[in-house]
């Protein structure tokens, strides 16, 4: 049994029609303040709900359930760290951004240190955001390719091109204002999808939800805490601290995530949004872990083979395999597809908008130019960013092997580290620095980190570096900045 491609394509078309309708209803006027900050009128609960979708990109949707087979529920340790990190963002960073009334959060670095720091910060955001958004879209494009477009003989490149084109169409007028709304829609699809999948798979195993929670099969997957050996990559302390810093950087120091928060009416609303969002996120991630366990129980019971990609077994493809090809009916297939597409696009569309915003505000210095000129540059940037995404994804397809979640988090460790160092130094100390040397300090800390990250664990006495790469990298930058401070 397989779902027919025609049904799948119909679902995709209907989904995007829905998005276009929403984007037309929210368009308002075409000016840059709508595109960049939604005229600061977004209702906080919409932002909070939509952010869940953007954080739980396609990666969470496929890789988190897929990783349960090897790491069980240990990812939840990282998630608890996230929760703590969100409190830091809400109580420490948001007040600063609101007080300075920023459009791009990297303007803080310009105010605090100077323009080289500003450009350096924005540059690191650029690299991490482009690769991050491409990772997410790449993952989904591969699933769509493998389960739909191969049968129609449509090459991968075309799949990607169409994907990005669709995003471009519904964001190029409304920008962030549209995205706050479309993300809400996308989060809804994602939640329905995970809940329905849990329900339908339990049903086919003839379990109620409580049967599943109490089952012996679940016990073999539900180990959360790793506290035995500190050398272990997934040790609780390392995962928790790592998770906390991942949030502080990948949310708090990230234009993409903060841009939605800065569209709220006031600091109080933005903080409320952040706290509620973090609690919802923890619950939702736990649902994804439960789903993961369920998928593995189901596949071992019915002998479903995990598909391969480039000759290696790829756990990321287990969920799509079960949803689309295991005879559970069209409903689960359709909800899976909607959830997956929603997950991927809700992070990619905001990435496209935030990259455009960052370029216009941080590099092109548009604030002093005439309004028409600003809009022209913004539109041109938007098109170029879209093309960059397409090219990078096609490069990924030809050169990538590891499981996607690892790749993304390792990469984040290298590119968000300097941002962590710069912001921490700015907030925690009062020193001025020799601005022109900033790029040397940040580049060096990244190079040193890449070297440390590639060391064999035997050198470090069996110590495996995990998620704590990021805080270490930030610390290096921090120390470097102390060295170039003005006496």
PLM segments and residue spans:
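Membrane-embedded helix-loop-helix hairpins and adjacent transmembrane boundary segments
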Residues: 3-487
